Curated annotation (Swiss-Prot):
Annotated disulfide bonds: none
Record's protein name: UPF0232 protein MAP_0004
Biased composition (Basic and acidic residues): 18-39
Compositionally biased spans, kind Polar residues: 1-11
Region entry Disordered, spans: 1-70, 161-181
Annotated family: Belongs to the UPF0232 family.
Residue stretches of biased makeup (Low complexity): 40-50
Organism, as annotated: Mycolicibacterium paratuberculosis (strain ATCC BAA-968 / K-10) (Mycobacterium paratuberculosis)
InterPro entries for this protein: DciA-like (IPR007922), UPF0232_actinobac (IPR023007)
UniProt xrefs under Pfam families: DciA (PF05258)
Length: 181
């Protein structure tokens, strides 16, 4: 059988004839659009243009492609995602010794930070009083370490008095007095 033969004896085109006709129509449509009929690409391929600078190798100086320190990457990530306030709060609580110094950190512990108010628990009433007198200097040290506005005020408390309750039934006693702290 040659390609020139007409449809089947019954007068209807065969499946192969329909496929050939569809292929010829597709090739004609591709040629009309200026494409190469065999591959579907443009007849005259244009050379690709590379945007930006050509690839170059790193020189002896610093380059944007050089490995970056992990701390800088973490800081940039926190800044981009809006975590800076939470990171600053965590710095106050996590690096308390570095923020206020060893002597104060040995006698006082931060217990929480909420809405800019840092709660600090001192080991004795004397240390609580001393820290209340140094409150301005402590706020300045904290602001220098983590930035302004993270801690706006301090709530300094002394040690908690022990509980004298010894069971489910309790009679009110005289209270803790001034024995502790």
């Amino acid at each position: 059988m040659s390609d020139d033969q007409s449809p089947s004896p019954s007068g209807e085109p065969t499946a192969m004839d329909l496929v050939r006709r569809t292929l010829e129509e597709a090739r004609a449509a591709a040629r009309a659009q200026g494409k190469d009929a065999g591959r579907g690409r443009a007849a005259a391929p244009t050379p690709r243009r590379v945007a930006g600078q050509r690839r170059s190798w790193s020189g002896p100086g610093p380059d944007a492609r050089d490995p970056q320190p992990l701390g800088r990457l973490a800081r940039d990530l926190a800044r981009k995602r809006g975590w800076s306030a939470q990171v600053a709060e965590g710095t106050v609580l996590g690096n308390w010794t570095a923020v206020v110094g060893h002597q104060i950190a040995d006698h006082a512990v931060p217990t929480g930070l909420r809405d800019g108010v840092l709660s600090v628990s001192a080991e004795s009433t004397a240390w609580a009083t001393q820290l209340r007198m140094m409150q301005a200097q402590l706020l300045a040290k904290i602001a220098a370490a983590v930035g302004n506005g993270v801690v706006t005020s301090l709530k300094i408390t002394g040690p908690a008095a022990p509980s004298w309750r010894k069971g489910p039934r309790h009679i009110a006693g005289r209270g803790p007095r001034d024995t502790y702290g």
